[in-house]
Amino acid sequence: MNFSFALGALLATSVAAFAPNAAAPRAVSVSKSTLNAFSSTIFDVREVKFAETEELIVQGGRDLFPLLPKAFEGIKEIGVIGWGSQAPAQAQNLRDSLAEAGCDIKVRIGLREGSSSFEEAREVGFSEDADTLGEMYDIIKKSDLVMLLISDAAQAALYKEIFAAMKPGATLGLSHGFLHGYLESIGEDFPEDMDVIAVCPKGMGPSVRRLYEQGKKTNGAGINASFAVHQDKSGKATELALGWGVALGSPFMFETTLGSEYRSDIYGERGILLGAVHGIVESLYRRYQRQGMSPEEAFNQSSESITGNITKIISTKGIKAVYDGLEGDDKEIFKQAYSASYMPSKEILQEIYDEVSSGNEIRTVIMHGKRIAKFPVGKIDGTDCWQVGEKVRAERDEESIPLNPFTAGVYVATMMAQIDVLLEAGHPYSEVVNESVIEAVDSLCPYMHYRGVAFMVDNCSFTAKTGSRKWAPRFDYILDQLAYTAVDNGKPVNEDIISAFESHRVHEAVEECCKLRPSVDISVDSASSTKEIVIE
């Protein structure tokens, strides 16, 4: 059965309930008062200072695997439902970690009847014969922990049937707050008689698996994760959520709420994580050619400069290190680009946050799901920019990739604008830095560096790739129309904007997060059991 057709049919009634004139949730600031109050009798909870605030985190590592049996106490069967971006990685990581910990817990995959993903699941060791692969509702009925990792749009279409199929006392596990946002928007909520938790890796699924595999000899590596305990009827939900994160290989976990998570996550991927960086590269590629560069050099000075130099500095030394490493004219060029780009980028980013917080962006995803049978997801790397990029990558010399100061100014300005919108909305530093910095430089940009923008975007979720395609052109347009023309017309550098960047407290938070980064750098070209997508 064609998934696009099936999803479109399932969403018909869901979209009607979630029509544009439906009551939307009020845009609200995220309260920090509900966070940083968790405790654990199993894992060590650390207090970390992020800029002017203190937050609680749990640091992961393979040395914690012996604690997993206690964290998963009472869980005998886990059902991982779906096989999209996150499910293949999380299912394999959980299976491997629980086995290493000596847990007698069965991890099963649940899929739609007739799904083409059955074969992909078999290829990595799940099977009907071993009772680790089956039809989704059969698996849901058996599971003590239901990890609902089907697409957000499918969750919105099927949530009633899924809740009804869950056995009494089972825990619902999510990796995104989207379903909460959807239910909130239509005046509904999760059933009161179940635990509802979330563990949300701050990176695409393939990177969750790749870093787990590559970090086996360094006490584990993976992708940082947020966790949320939305309902705790059993009194064990926090320990289970933390155990889930440790089993995934998360270097550290920080607390959030489902509401804060979906606002920051949906917003972030439309911004610097995916949509904005796509728009930045396209606009700079054209600009540099207008200035006389060859197509190949224009790609080097735009995309390659971001993924091969700028993001690597940010990953290990922080955002400000990019600026501090420049001298003389290069630093002045950075200031011009940063000053001109900050407010135009922030204008779009504030619009995105408002659209997400109001429920409008959730409606976009739901409605796109309804249209997908008629209008399948298309390629985004057919433009001259990305075609030239294939040639550049084939001839690449990593040691000679430039750090273009203008490119750096535009990219860093957009990243900082994204950070400021989240901070102004009340999100904690741990969430802000992970959704604006760490995920970009440690999970996503390495994929664009390896194979281009489509390889990065299309290995993310349906929600992410929908939003990236929608908002990338907006960044492309506003930077071209407002930022670059301001520079070309000789508009003076706004020293207040530069001063705010130089003294921003987020630099302290990023510095602290750099200490908690994965123990290895991701290698995208090495062998892996992860599922990765290329749209032909």
PLM regions and their residue ranges:
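N-terminal chloroplast transit peptides
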Residues: N2-P25
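Glycine/serine-rich phosphate-binding loop and adjoining beta1-alpha1 elements at the start
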Residues: V28-I75, L111-R112, V229-Q231, G245-T257, ...
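NAD(P)-dependent Rossmann-like dehydrogenase/reductase catalytic/cofactor-binding core
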Residues: L35-R62, A221, E282, R290-E536
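NAD(P)-binding Rossmann-fold cofactor-contacting core
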Residues: E47, R95-F126
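Glycine-rich adenosine-cofactor-binding loop
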Residues: I75-L94, R396, M415
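Rossmann-like NAD(P)-binding element
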Residues: R112-E113, R122-G181, D189-S207, E213-G215, ...
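Rossmann-fold dinucleotide-binding core
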Residues: L174-R270, G328-D329, S358, K370-S400
